[in-house]
Amino acid sequence: MAENQYYGTGRRKSSSARVFIKPGSGNIVINKRSLEVYFGRETARMVVRQPLELVDMLGKLDLYITVKGGGISGQAGAIRHGITRALMAYDETLRSDLRKAGFVTRDAREVERKKVGLRKARRRPQFSKR
């Protein structure tokens, strides 16, 4: 591995992402595929690019990312969290800007478990008075 490489781990819902950044031309590779191929949805691509756009590093860093677990939205959020942590390892002065944008904090919301006797986590079966 390169000596000028920085690492960050990101998590969101049931997804976890490992992000490696190094100076380069702006290539983003996710699970050996490009960002455009991996995420079909434009919103997911925007979420991934958010921290890089905020600190003006979009074309200056190469990203190599492995992500597993969860769905599209969770994976995009995990990647964003990982990129944020890797950027902080790269340059600690970026922390305050990233914190203000809310990217540093891990989104702790998880799926609520299904309860016995209910149809979903909170949805009760229909009540019949008579």
Curated annotation (Swiss-Prot):
InterPro entries: Ribosomal_Su5_D2-typ_SF, Ribosomal_uS9, Ribosomal_uS9_bac/plastid, Ribosomal_uS9_CS, Ribsml_uS5_D2-typ_fold_subgr. GO terms for molecular function: RNA binding; structural constituent of ribosome. Pfam families: Ribosomal_S9 (PF00380). Keywords: Ribonucleoprotein, Ribosomal protein. GO terms for cellular component: cytosolic small ribosomal subunit. The keyword Oxidoreductase does not apply. GO terms for biological process: translation. SUPFAM superfamilies: Ribosomal protein S5 domain 2-like. Belongs to the universal ribosomal protein uS9 family. This is Small ribosomal subunit protein uS9. It comes from Photorhabdus laumondii subsp. laumondii (strain DSM 15139 / CIP 105565 / TT01) (Photorhabdus luminescens subsp. laumondii). The gene is rpsI.
